[in-house]
Amino acid sequence: MTQDELKRLVGQAAADYVIQNVPEGAVIGVGTGSTANCFIDALAAVKSRYRGAVSSSIATTERLKSHGIKVFDLNEIESLQVYVDGADEIDAGGAMIKGGGGALTREKIVASVADTFVCIADASKRVPVLGAFPLPIEVVPMARTAIGRRVTALGGVPVLRVTKDGAPYITDNGNEIIDVKGLQIADPRGFEAQVNAWPGVVTVGLFAERGANLCLLGTENGVETIVYPAG
């Protein structure tokens, strides 16, 4: 199967998981990116079962609304039973690198209030050690260079994310993103806490403190379900 076919496979598997495990009338947390889009497309077929969704980005909001799925502000919702999102990398403990699509901060916020984080990914995203995929850090623009120096001191190579015309990429929150190459992140939880403590960092695209509870992994043999231990 192609990568796109695997994404559609896990998108449908996530919709099936929601149908089987989330009661009718609930609100679903939805991530951002091409794999999350496949979940949205599959969820649209059963949208009448649910009140709607909480979105993690402007792009996801637009896609949900295009399917007629009501979008709630997170401040309107007391709790979420499930959050479904993709990953750029996921390790054996359920820690992830996320943020390739630029929505890492809102993704982390929505994931933090969900009872269950369901990661959907193709098998290429499963790695023994995080870091081959550049680690995104969302930063307040005035702190960009200072954060870059801190990254360099740790052995990373900071690269400012830019648009096609060479201008800095601006997140939905009005900030910039540094993508860090050359890392091997043996302690994702510790590294997440370290980077998040730097002044000027909005958040780092490590999802270790709040990692995945479950991964639906698309493989040539179908969908593999991986459950991660709590904590």
UniProtKB/Swiss-Prot annotation:
Give coiled-coil spans as residue ranges: none
The record ties this protein, via Gene3D superfamilies, to: 3.30.70.260, 3.40.50.1360
Q: CDD domains given for it? A: RPI_A
Name the GO terms of the biological process aspect. Answer: D-ribose metabolic process; pentose-phosphate shunt, non-oxidative branch
GO MF entries: ribose-5-phosphate isomerase activity
Q: Which GO terms describe its cellular component?
A: cytosol
Please write the reaction equations for the catalytic activity of this protein: aldehydo-D-ribose 5-phosphate = D-ribulose 5-phosphate
Active site: residue positions:
E107
Enzyme class, top EC level, equals isomerase
Q: Does the keyword Isomerase apply?
A: yes
Keywords (alphabetical) are: Isomerase
| tRNA processing is among the record's keywords | no
Q: What is its EC number?
A: 5.3.1.6
Its pathway, per UniProt, is: Carbohydrate degradation; pentose phosphate pathway; D-ribose 5-phosphate from D-ribulose 5-phosphate (non-oxidative stage): step 1/1
Task: Enumerate the residues binding substrate.
Answer: T32, G33, S34, T35, D85, G86, A87, D88, K98, G99, G100, G101, K125
Q: What does this protein's UniProt record list under function?
A: Catalyzes the reversible conversion of ribose-5-phosphate to ribulose 5-phosphate.
Write down the HAMAP family for this protein, in alphabetical order: Rib_5P_isom_A
Q: Could you tell me which PANTHER family the record lists for this protein?
A: RIBOSE-5-PHOSPHATE ISOMERASE
In the record, the note on similarity to other proteins reads:
Belongs to the ribose 5-phosphate isomerase family.
How the protein assembles, per its UniProt entry? Answer: Homodimer.
Q: What is this protein called?
A: Ribose-5-phosphate isomerase A
Q: From what organism does this protein derive? A: Burkholderia cenocepacia (strain HI2424)
UniProt lists the gene as rpiA
